[in-house]
Regions:
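Alpha-helical transmembrane segments and their immediate juxtamembrane cytosolic regions
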Residues: 1-381
Length: 381
């Protein structure tokens, strides 16, 4: 009977996290937002494209890591562990606010919601629950969250409205965002609602709780490796099917973070982690030392080991390249990004040029992260 070591466990999570972060850099840094291949676009409203998997996958792996990081429920250590959880959450939220402030330089129009803000909030809620609730209650707590969120979303119209609208800016979540944060502090491109708003943040807690479920299977010391992998695949298939069926009545929607979206994306996350665990088991069983998982997927693993660094760094550099300008020989003022991107014009295909620019971003960060990995330098919060 083969048991899994923490090293293998961390390896699989780093790989899944790394592929997610690499995907995030690819979709967030096109040469031009006007020329993007369809799979690299978010769904306009309802639906779920490959790009719409990035954020829920990241929240899922946050949950999957909790059973390994928040490992003690001994009353002597709970207060100390919870203090660390609070510090980490506050740090993530503050970094997220700084990223929103960078380049805008305006407190009066500072966007309060954001990706890191949601990660910090959800991590704080889920890790705190993991400390105080019994394990069985933790593993099913995502169910009442989705039930209540769905009921409020489809049954309660915003004040002043007589019926429920699940359209941009017209749902109850958008009303909550406007009244909690104020329109000046929402995403400037949507203005009256925010894709990382408060109400959708509640249902995203369920995504991370499902990640905890997966992490609990992986960290179990009672089951052998094959049974754990079969359990992960089984739950993954079940969740994907339920999500697809639920989509018929409540469409998948990232901005609303609907229940069908939560279930479907969590199912795909289960299947992805199950695949990496199975591949790792297969390679070790056949003793293909030259084909170790670390070697095959090294480009993705380095992204997973320094996820926060690359997320923050890529955001800051992308904003800086748009802010800094240079003067051309004809006197025209353009951003550094536009200057670099224009060097790809010889290709003659706007979509391909935009994609190659994004790939250069990915390559740039892979080189940096590979150097840091060789030196064992990892930025953790």
């Amino acid at each position: 009977m083969e048991k899994k070591s923490n090293q293998n466990r961390i390896l699989s999570l780093d790989l899944f996290r790394g592929m997610t972060v690499a995907g995030m850099i690819l979709v967030n840094n096109p040469g031009s937002w006007s020329f993007i291949y369809t799979p690299l676009k978010h769904a306009k409203w309802n639906g779920c494209t490959p790009t719409d998997l990035v954020f829920p996958f990241f929240l899922f792996v946050v949950g999957t890591s909790i059973p390994f990081s928040v490992y003690s429920k001994n009353k002597i250590y709970i207060s100390k562990i919870w203090f660390g959880i609070c510090i980490r959450s506050i740090t993530l939220i503050l970094i997220g606010l700084f990223l929103n402030f960078f380049g805008e330089w305006s407190f009066s129009k500072l966007r309060i919601p954001g990706i890191l803000q949601r990660i910090g909030f959800v991590y704080w809620v889920v890790a705190s629950l993991y400390l105080i609730l019994p394990k069985r209650m933790i593993l099913i707590s995502w169910i009442p969250i989705l039930i209540v969120h769905t009921w409020v979303l489809i049954q309660i119209p915003p004040p002043g409205e007589s019926i429920v609208y699940l359209e941009p800016g017209k749902d109850i979540g958008a009303w909550i965002d406007r009244n909690v944060f104020g329109e000046n502090h929402l995403w400037k491109f949507s203005k009256t609602w925010d894709p990382e708003g408060f109400f959708s943040g509640i249902s995203s807690i369920a995504t991370t709780l499902l990640g905890v479920f997966c992490g609990s299977i992986l960290s179990s010391k009672t089951n052998e490796t094959k049974k754990q992998i079969l359990s992960i695949f089984g739950f993954g298939i079940l969740l994907v099917l339920v999500g697809l069926l639920w989509d018929k009545n409540l469409p998948m929607n990232k901005s609303l973070w609907t229940g069908s979206y939560v279930i479907y994306t969590a199912g795909l996350a289960f299947l992805s982690i199950g695949f990496f665990e199975f591949l790792n088991l297969l390679l070790r069983a056949k003793k293909w030392n030259q084909l170790k998982l670390e070697t095959i997927f090294q480009p993705f693993l380095v992204f997973g080991k320094n996820a926060i660094l690359v997320f923050v760094g890529s955001g800051l550099i992308a904003r800086t390249l748009n802010l800094w300008t240079i003067v051309l020989e004809n006197g025209k003022l353009i951003s550094i990004k536009t200057f670099f991107y224009s060097k790809l014009n010889f290709i003659g295909n706007s979509h391909l040029e935009s994609f190659i620019y994004a790939m250069f971003n990915l390559l740039f960060w892979w080189i940096i992260l590979s150097v840091l990995d060789k030196k064992k330098i990892y930025i953790k919060i």
